[in-house]
């Protein structure tokens, strides 16, 4: 893709350029938003009128005065006014007073692009229904591939491929689908008896190839097939198809190949619940999801190595190892580099499997690590201007993304785009040949001769049968206005990381200020822009009492449609710390620092087997308002101190 003329290399994203990115906490950019939306809606009307202008208007000028027309307009206005009134009870994600879940204000380029595209109503299932936006979606996949370090040159055979999804859940499902198709395909080739290919010697070896080798075998098969006469080509394609897992189904496939077992998926205990849903949807079964313990908020790679060795010894196949780049609850990064290394060692011993990174939250943080030419910045280069970011483990995890097989990223999280916009990216697009579904009424026509032509029939390769082109336009335009490197989009994510460091420092000051009344700690060093805070009233030793105290604090920071929004000073969220996520040593350390007796972490299933903590997602770029000299982070801790004292006073009075 050519460099975006709107954002040249010598023009980094500055503070005042950030000011133009959003509608703003106070709606400061309302004139700009209104001007552009009206301009492009008018442009859409002109487009309609210029399509065969000789056709007479189907709606007469007199229709607007007819009683039925007026009655419909009146009813529509009434319902829209009621909708608008009801929406005033929505959570104010746009405000720097919101520090709750993974959502903030929307980037105006994406918002306007989505509004602009909606009246055209493109369906990105194919170029017949979306001749413009389907190309944009393919480009978005390449933009994201470049951001994570995958090959993004469509002229290369091993170029990456990505597409948008409704969210991270569907992207994770697509990752499972791709990994399973690739894992089982060499077995189908053996069963079909395809000649002239260097096939593995038995089903076990075929089912446990390294993904790179399985992809090369797929490419060899397609090359061999293309060289056959037309009739034989059709025969061999059908023969292999009838041996594939997708054709036979799980039961028949594993019955025919008795030495094989349904593969496991290895994931950290902090993995999103979508992995459980995905295994159920795919028919693998929830029991195949093996959740591994954490050590210091990161996947315990010793446990991973032990599990892989046990699987190899017991001849239990593994479908994939999952790393999380920015956990939903804590924002922490798993050691992607060490997980990839563990896979390489296992594959060398005959236990090949995929590595997938669930970077739904942390994916866009890679912009901070990328130069304009797509190369990786050193840790020292990235660290300039920060107090502690990035930890060596974080830089190593980002650097290793290029060595993984697939990645989930959510533009509707740290990409500041409307909900309903996730993304799946695979390292090598050739594997999508295993996903292709043919439907002549949608995908008929000549065979594709290039990367872009191939993926204009996007619906052949994705789970959805219909998908919004407006979402693709929103992401594409956003990435064009804010290229995915440290000078452009990375300046925005940098603001959030600086806010996280400021919050961490503020939490330490808060703890000193409240010493003797409440014990407060940041339980672990933040990896990203999500910071947790653990609290316990001084003198209390019971986990149940500490949990009840934090619940009462959070009650004042949660949305309540029965109350006016203005009664809320701040919005936050909460989560829990569990021994299986932290490890016993870390859990004991945290409980000890809070003055809690570990014996009261009873684990009887009534909620006191975990510690409830406050969770703060620091996405808003105006948490530190330089224009007005206001720190909403400082205001938050002032508010928190006041609420803590009120709750303690009420408890003492009782």
Residue ranges and their predicted role:
Residues 517-596:
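Conserved PLP-binding catalytic core of the aspartate aminotransferase-like
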Residues 223-264, 386-406, 594-611:
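Intrinsically disordered, low-complexity acidic Ser/Thr-rich regulatory segments
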Residues 295-297, 321-333, 352-397:
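Conserved PLP phosphate-binding loop immediately N-terminal to the Schiff-base lysine helix
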Residues 2-160, 170, 183-191, 220-223, ...:
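N-terminal entrance/gating region of PLP-dependent enzymes' catalytic architecture
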Residues 178-182, 280-286, 335-340, 369-381, ...:
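Short secondary-structure boundary/capping segments
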Residues 157-159, 260, 523-530, 609-611:
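Short Gly/Ser/Thr- and Asp/Glu-enriched loop/turn motifs at secondary-structure junctions
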Residues 2-28, 103-115, 120, 124-319, ...:
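PLP-dependent aspartate aminotransferase-fold enzymes
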Residues 331, 380-527, 534-541:
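Active-site C-terminal subdomain of aminotransferase-like
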């Amino acid at each position: 893709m050519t460099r975006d003329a709107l954002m040249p290399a010598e023009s980094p994203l500055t503070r005042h350029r950030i000011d133009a990115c959003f509608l703003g906490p106070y709606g400061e950019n309302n004139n700009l938003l209104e001007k552009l939306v009206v301009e492009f809606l008018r442009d859409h009307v002109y487009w309609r009128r210029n399509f065969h202008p000789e056709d007479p208007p189907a709606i007469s000028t007199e229709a607007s005065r007819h009683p039925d027309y007026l009655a419909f307009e009146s009813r529509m206005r009434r319902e829209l006014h009621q909708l608008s009134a009801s929406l005033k009870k929505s959570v104010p994600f746009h405000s720097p007073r919101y520090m709750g879940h993974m959502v903030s204000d929307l980037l105006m380029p994406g918002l306007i692009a989505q509004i602009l595209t909606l009246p055209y109503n493109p369906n990105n299932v194919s170029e017949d229904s979306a001749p413009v936006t389907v190309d944009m979606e393919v480009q978005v996949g390449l933009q994201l591939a470049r951001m994570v370090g995958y090959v993004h040159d469509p002229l290369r055979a091993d170029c990456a491929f990505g597409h948008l999804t409704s969210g991270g859940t569907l992207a994770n499902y697509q990752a499972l689908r791709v990994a399973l198709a690739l894992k089982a395909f060499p077995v189908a080739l053996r069963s079909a008896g395809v000649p002239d290919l260097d096939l593995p010697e038995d089903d076990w070896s075929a089912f446990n190839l390294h993904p790179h080798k399985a992809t090369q075998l797929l490419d060899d098969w397609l090359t061999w097939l293309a060289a056959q006469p037309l009739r034989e080509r059709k025969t061999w394609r059908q023969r292999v198809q009838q041996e594939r897992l997708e054709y036979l189904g799980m039961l028949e496939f594993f019955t025919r190949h008795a030495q094989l077992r349904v593969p496991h998926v290895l994931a950290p205990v902090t993995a999103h619940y979508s992995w459980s849903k995905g295994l159920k949807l795919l028919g693998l079964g929830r029991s195949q999801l093996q959740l591994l313990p954490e050590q210091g908020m990161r996947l315990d790679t010793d446990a991973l190595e032990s599990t892989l060795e046990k699987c190899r010894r017991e001849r239990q196949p593994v479908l994939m190892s999952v790393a999380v780049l920015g956990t939903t609850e804590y924002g922490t990064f798993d050691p992607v580099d060490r997980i990839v290394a563990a896979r390489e060692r296992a594959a060398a011993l005959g236990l090949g499997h995929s590595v997938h990174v669930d970077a739904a939250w942390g994916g866009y943080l890679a912009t901070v690590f990328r130069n304009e030419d797509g190369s990786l910045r050193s840790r020292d280069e990235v660290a300039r201007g920060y107090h502690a970011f990035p930890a060596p483990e974080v830089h190593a995890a980002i650097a290793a993304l290029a060595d993984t097989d697939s990645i989930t990223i959510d533009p509707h999280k740290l990409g500041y785009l409307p909900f309903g916009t996730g993304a799946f990216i695979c390292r090598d697009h050739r594997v999508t040949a295993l996903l292709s579904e043919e439907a002549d009424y949608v995908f008929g026509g000549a065979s594709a001769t290039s990367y872009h032509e191939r993926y204009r029939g996007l619906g052949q390769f994705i789970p959805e049968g219909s998908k919004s082109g407006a979402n693709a336009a929103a992401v594409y335009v956003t990435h064009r206005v804010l290229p995915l490197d440290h000078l452009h989009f990375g300046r925005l994510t940098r603001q959030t990381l600086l806010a996280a460091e400021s919050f961490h420092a503020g939490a330490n000051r808060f703890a000193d200020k409240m010493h003797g009344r409440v014990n407060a700690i940041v339980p672990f060093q933040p990896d990203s822009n999500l910071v947790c805070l653990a609290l316990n009233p001084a003198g209390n030793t019971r986990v149940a009492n500490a949990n009840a105290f934090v619940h009462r604090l959070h009650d004042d920071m949660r949305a309540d449609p029965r109350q006016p929004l203005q009664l809320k000073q701040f919005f936050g969220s909460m989560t829990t710390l569990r021994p299986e996520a932290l490890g016993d040593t870390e859990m004991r350390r945290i409980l000890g620092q809070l003055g809690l007796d570990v014996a009261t972490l009873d684990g009887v299933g009534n909620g006191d087997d975990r510690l409830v903590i406050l969770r703060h997602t620091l996405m808003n770029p105006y948490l530190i308002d330089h224009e007005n000299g206001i720190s909403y982070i400082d205001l938050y801790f002032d508010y928190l101190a006041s609420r803590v004292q009120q709750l303690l006073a009420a408890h003492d009075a009782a």
